[in-house]
Amino acid sequence: MAGEIHRITKETLEKLKAEWTELTTVGRTENARVIEAARLLGDLSENGDYHAAKDHQGKMEARIRQIDHVIRNHELVERDGNAGTVQYASIVQIVYEDDADDDFQEFFIGSIEEKPDEVLVASPTSPLGSALLEKAIGELVEYEAPSGILRVKIVGIR
């Protein structure tokens, strides 16, 4: 993670700041309360509630560190006004060579922090993401995957 720059939109930055604030205030306070209540139940070595609360605390602290890293190491980007081509933050519908157009997969071109729930993510620096940038609907795109050269057709952009 060191030195990594996260390209995100202003909206995502604001969302991350709000999540960080929520986790570092309400989240930590509530988790401390749950840990203390579980501690009062007795022997900690066999206390499932206590161990679950401590596990949750670890995951929450990891998320806080992750958000903090993104906030400290971000570059704001704006989506280009050219809706006819794939841009940062576009959702692209692609089909692999020889597949039917209605058998598409959707990829969000951007950061995992911005990912809409219903789609996969392709980083703009990944082989697929970089190959799709600036391309238009109907174009055939080649990119190198671990299994070799793959060809996809862009069937939709939103």
For each feature predicted by the language model, list its residue ranges.
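Residue-level signal for pocket-adjacent positions within structured domains
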Residues: 3, 39, 45, 71-72, ...
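Internal alpha/beta loop-helix hairpins
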Residues: 48-80, 84
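N-terminal cationic and glycine-rich segments that engage phosphates or anionic surfaces
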Residues: 2-59
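Generic structural "secondary-structure junction" signal
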Residues: 10, 25, 43-46, 73, ...
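Conserved, well-folded catalytic cores of nucleic-acid-processing
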Residues: 23-26, 34, 38, 63, ...
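Short amphipathic alpha-helical segments, especially helix-boundary/capping motifs
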Residues: 8-13, 66-67, 105-106
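General N-terminal targeting signals
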Residues: 18, 25, 30, 40, ...
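Non-DNA-binding regulatory cores of transcription-related proteins
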Residues: 77-153, 158
